[in-house]
């Protein structure tokens, strides 16, 4: 993987003595890829790229977004109209969010139709399903953050759905909203989920997902 000029350098020798980077590079570059693999096997990787874009653009917007009922919408308008390239950053965030959900759905279908969930890859499939749920939850929580009419009523409807569950339904609604009605506590909880809980959760399950894929390799043809 490394050229002779690189391997002869002092920097390479320094890292090689301490981390054995040649072995790591060989493991990455010589992994067997089955001949039946085609472009549809790249859908998972495209989903990852979309997430990286989401993380970068979302992080950029946290410098200007204000998660309060009174200022959320005005801060989003400020990002769109006043911040340099703010309109582009938020637009890319929205477009890549839609693309991430689409690629995730197509990836799930590809894995299911090609039997990639079968033994010995059951746990890889389980972590993938968890990642799919987290991805959808990202969309639901992010949709509310502008706190406009669309976001407000979306939160009100989504947070009211658990009320139909027997016994614990009302408690779940209160847990999601932070109170009996939709308000500041609801926005704070959705913002915390969207910017802290979900990113850490998806990072952990992505790591598990990729480690299992590296260990087991790509599934064979049907």
Curated annotation (Swiss-Prot):
Matches recorded under InterPro entries: Cyt_b/b6_N, Cyt_B6_PetB, Cytb/b6-like_sf, Cytochrome_b_N_euk/bac, Di-haem_cyt_TM
Residues at which heme b 2 binds: 93, 194
Keywords of this entry: Electron transport, Heme, Iron, Membrane, Metal-binding, Photosynthesis, Thylakoid, Transmembrane, Transmembrane helix, Transport
GO biological process: one example: respiratory electron transport chain
Subcellular localization: Cellular thylakoid membrane
Segments passing through the bilayer: 39-59, 97-117, 123-143, 193-213
GO cellular component term of the entry, any: plasma membrane-derived thylakoid membrane
Cofactor note: Binds 2 heme b groups non-covalently with two histidine residues as axial ligands.
Binding site for heme b 1: 107, 209
Example GO molecular function: electron transporter, transferring electrons within cytochrome b6/f complex of photosystem II activity
Annotated membrane topology: Multi-pass membrane protein
Cofactor (UniProt): heme b; heme c
Disulfide bonds: none
SUPFAM superfamilies reported in the protein's UniProt record: Transmembrane di-heme cytochromes
Miscellaneous notes: Heme 1 (or BH or b566) is high-potential and absorbs at about 566 nm, and heme 2 (or BL or b562) is low-potential and absorbs at about 562 nm.
HAMAP family found in the cross-reference section: Cytb6_f_cytb6
UniProt family annotation: Belongs to the cytochrome b family. PetB subfamily.
Subunit relationships: The 4 large subunits of the cytochrome b6-f complex are cytochrome b6, subunit IV (17 kDa polypeptide, PetD), cytochrome f and the Rieske protein, while the 4 small subunits are PetG, PetL, PetM and PetN. The complex functions as a dimer.
Function: Component of the cytochrome b6-f complex, which mediates electron transfer between photosystem II (PSII) and photosystem I (PSI), cyclic electron flow around PSI, and state transitions.
Identification of the protein by name: Cytochrome b6
Species annotation: Microcystis aeruginosa (strain NIES-843 / IAM M-2473)
Phylogenetic classification of the source organism: Bacteria, Bacillati, Cyanobacteriota, Cyanophyceae, Oscillatoriophycideae
Primary gene name: petB
